[in-house]
Amino acid sequence: MIRPAPWVGAGHRGRGGEAGACTESLGSESGDVGCDAAEIDQFFPPAPAAGGPDDAGAEPCIPDLAAAAAAGKRRRGGFPPPMPRASGPLFLRAERRGGRLILTEVRADERERRVVFRAERDGGRLRLRFANDGDGPEAAGGGGGAGGGGGELCQVAAGRRGVQVGAVMMGAI
């Protein structure tokens, strides 16, 4: 028999020691729930042993595997929908205003979108450099070889109109 539990506010300890007595301290760092075994047994009496007098004539409980699998799928849910990519002429521009990150959708010219970066291999490393439409990799980054640093890339970004740089990572890939 299932007894309906009285509605109790969070952390409420009533006269009769309702369920709020056991849930009062949930979430504490120590894990102490603030009740003892006697309080738990009061609300949730132990189940009778299998094969006792109540089991005479009872049908055995066989779990329904299909129902259990369906319930598991409902609990897990599916993957969230995929995030939209900047595959078209739209992209997001990030800027900070008053300590908040503001993302603004911007429509870009198709030709400009394709030439933001140029990739090259240099000494076993992949380098991304800002590119102008007619420039080669040397002119876009301000020099070749392994001497270019992150500051050099940021200076190029500051000279470009409409390019936002959040971080420049230099290192072996």
UniProtKB/Swiss-Prot annotation:
GO BP annotations listed: regulation of starch metabolic process
Function of the protein: Involved in starch metabolism in endosperm. Acts as a modifier of SUGARY1 (SU1), an isoamylase starch-debranching enzyme involved in amylopectin biosynthesis in endosperm.
Family per similarity comment: Belongs to the fantastic four family.
Gene, per the UniProt record: SE1
The protein's name: Protein SUGARY ENHANCER 1
Xref: PANTHER family: FANTASTIC FOUR-LIKE PROTEIN (DUF3049) (PTHR33155), PROTEIN SUGARY ENHANCER 1 (PTHR33155:SF7)
InterPro entries: FAF (IPR021410), FAF_dom (IPR046431)
Residue span of region Disordered: 1-31
Domain of life: Eukaryota
Pfam family, one: FAF
